[in-house]
């Protein structure tokens, strides 16, 4: 008798070129099982994780480049149960556009757990520094530095979302997800420095910004 799997629609958004598809395809099941929804121009990647509370599957909706042609259709967001907003830490404009993606997502999905991810932290020319990443704190989202190419923090967004969706803050993954081999590596000292920067940034008071988008 096969074990029942809890499945959730995960909406993945962000500017084109931020590494969304690369990120999803790091997971082996996401690489070889994907369904293309031609109507919406969407690829759906089922990503499976084993937890100490049973198996969970995120059906990750990836835009397949549709965001380059303007906003996404509501059909992309409808019935979304959780979300990841991605930007590129080497491109300030992709972070500047995060509020737009967040607005569109919550307009349709309202109160769903959302993770903000700053991708490409393996690149030395980081433009969006930890201290300038404040949007998640204003909107009560979770934030992670990630690197799709090095697999750095790959499982963190999924673990946080799984805990929220299961209503169990102590839920753990019981097996490391099968990931494609890393294409690059991040020096452990650099990782520690990034983590320290994030912790210090999160401890700072939020700037007084009178900006409707934020």
From Swiss-Prot:
<feature type="region of interest" description="Switch-II">
    <location>
        <begin position="65"/>
        <end position="81"/>
    </location>
</feature>
<dbReference type="GO" id="GO:0003924">
    <property type="term" value="F:GTPase activity"/>
</dbReference>
<protein>
    <recommendedName>
        <fullName>GTP-binding nuclear protein GSP1/Ran</fullName>
    </recommendedName>
</protein>
<dbReference type="InterPro" id="IPR027417">
    <property type="entry name" value="P-loop_NTPase"/>
</dbReference>
<comment type="subunit">
    <text>Found in a nuclear export complex with RanGTP, exportin and pre-miRNA.</text>
</comment>
<comment type="similarity">
    <text>Belongs to the small GTPase superfamily. Ran family.</text>
</comment>
<dbReference type="GO" id="GO:0000054">
    <property type="term" value="P:ribosomal subunit export from nucleus"/>
</dbReference>
<dbReference type="GO" id="GO:0005525">
    <property type="term" value="F:GTP binding"/>
</dbReference>
<feature type="binding site">
    <location>
        <position position="65"/>
    </location>
    <ligand>
        <name>GTP</name>
    </ligand>
</feature>
<dbReference type="GO" id="GO:0005737">
    <property type="term" value="C:cytoplasm"/>
</dbReference>
<dbReference type="InterPro" id="IPR002041">
    <property type="entry name" value="Ran_GTPase"/>
</dbReference>
<comment type="function">
    <text>GTP-binding protein involved in nucleocytoplasmic transport. Required for the import of protein into the nucleus and also for RNA export. Involved in chromatin condensation and control of cell cycle.</text>
</comment>
<feature type="binding site">
    <location>
        <begin position="119"/>
        <end position="122"/>
    </location>
    <ligand>
        <name>GTP</name>
    </ligand>
</feature>
<keyword id="KW-0539">Nucleus</keyword>
<dbReference type="GO" id="GO:0005634">
    <property type="term" value="C:nucleus"/>
</dbReference>
<dbReference type="InterPro" id="IPR001806">
    <property type="entry name" value="Small_GTPase"/>
</dbReference>
<dbReference type="GO" id="GO:0006606">
    <property type="term" value="P:protein import into nucleus"/>
</dbReference>
<keyword id="KW-0547">Nucleotide-binding</keyword>
<feature type="binding site">
    <location>
        <begin position="15"/>
        <end position="22"/>
    </location>
    <ligand>
        <name>GTP</name>
    </ligand>
</feature>
<keyword id="KW-0342">GTP-binding</keyword>
<keyword id="KW-0653">Protein transport</keyword>
<feature type="region of interest" description="Switch-I">
    <location>
        <begin position="34"/>
        <end position="42"/>
    </location>
</feature>
<feature type="domain" description="Small GTPase Ran-type">
    <location>
        <begin position="4"/>
        <end position="168"/>
    </location>
</feature>
<keyword id="KW-0813">Transport</keyword>
<dbReference type="Pfam" id="PF00071">
    <property type="entry name" value="Ras"/>
</dbReference>
<feature type="binding site">
    <location>
        <begin position="147"/>
        <end position="149"/>
    </location>
    <ligand>
        <name>GTP</name>
    </ligand>
</feature>
<dbReference type="InterPro" id="IPR005225">
    <property type="entry name" value="Small_GTP-bd"/>
</dbReference>
